[in-house]
Structure formats: structure tokens, C-alpha cells
Amino acid sequence: MIQGIGVDIVDIARMQQRIDAASGFRELVFSPAEITYCESKANKYESYAARFAAKEAFLKAVGIGIDFSIDLNQIEITNNKAGKPYFVYTKQVEALLLTHIGFVPDAQVSLSHSREQAIAFVLFNKN
């Protein structure tokens, strides 16, 4: 049974500005594995923007929003061998989810981008 859905769209040029500003934004928002993945891509800013959109869409789907006490770099988006993205949560995130919504969601995520924008759609079920 579907428990939550979320969607978010991110302007890629704005994401590039935030990452290039050298303010530590990249490390605050993305895990080391995500940074390695995005930096390996020819169009790295599209990958960063899509992952950022996924994190915001996830928080919307769960109903806790971006201002909740979850560090975004603790929610990781990685890919399986076929390239399908999926979420990996730290124990800290799992504990916060258990406290806030009573379970750790089995979230599905879809990412896409054009030259200007990235979008993510998240749907989750209760395990």
C-alpha cells in the first residue's frame, strides 16, 4: 500500500552555483559516495541536482520537510548494477524515521533531467 509520494524539481544552474561557491554545500548535502559518483560524470551538475531533488522529494513523501533534523548527506542515493537509483539510509536517519513516522519506508525513486532542470519522484510503501 502506498504510504507517501513526493516530487521535486531543481534548477541545474542554481545547483552548480551552490556547489562552485566553495561554501561546503556539497559536503553538507551529499555523501562521499555520491560526490565520487557525480564527479565521475561528464555532466556532474545534472547528477548533483537530480540527487538533491530526490532527497527533497523523499522528505516531502515522508512528510517531514527539508527543515527537519536529518542531515541530507545521511540520505544517500546510489544505483544498482542496472543503473536503477535507490536510497541508502544511515542508522541516524533510520532512527529519526522510526521516531517520526513509526517505520523505515521502502522508498522507490525515479530521477530525470534536461539541460536546465532535474526532477525526482519518490513513492514509498510501509515494510
Swiss-Prot record:
Matching entries from InterPro entries are given as:
4-PPantetheinyl_Trfase_dom, 4-PPantetheinyl_Trfase_dom_sf, ACPS, Ppantetheine-prot_Trfase_dom
Query: Which Pfam families does the entry link to?
Result: ACPS
- Quote the subcellular location field of this record: Cytoplasm
Q: What are the disulfide bonds?
A: none
Instruction: Tell me its EC number(s), please.
Output: 2.7.8.7
Q: Which residues bind Mg(2+)?
A: D8, E56
Keyword annotations for this protein, in alphabetical order, are: Cytoplasm, Fatty acid biosynthesis, Fatty acid metabolism, Lipid biosynthesis, Lipid metabolism, Magnesium, Metal-binding, Transferase
Q: Which GO terms describe its biological process?
A: fatty acid biosynthetic process
Q: What does this protein do?
A: Transfers the 4'-phosphopantetheine moiety from coenzyme A to a Ser of acyl-carrier-protein.
- Protein name in UniProt: Holo-[acyl-carrier-protein] synthase
Which organism was this protein described from? Cytophaga hutchinsonii (strain ATCC 33406 / DSM 1761 / CIP 103989 / NBRC 15051 / NCIMB 9469 / D465)
UniProt lineage? Bacteria, Pseudomonadati, Bacteroidota, Cytophagia, Cytophagales
Its gene is acpS
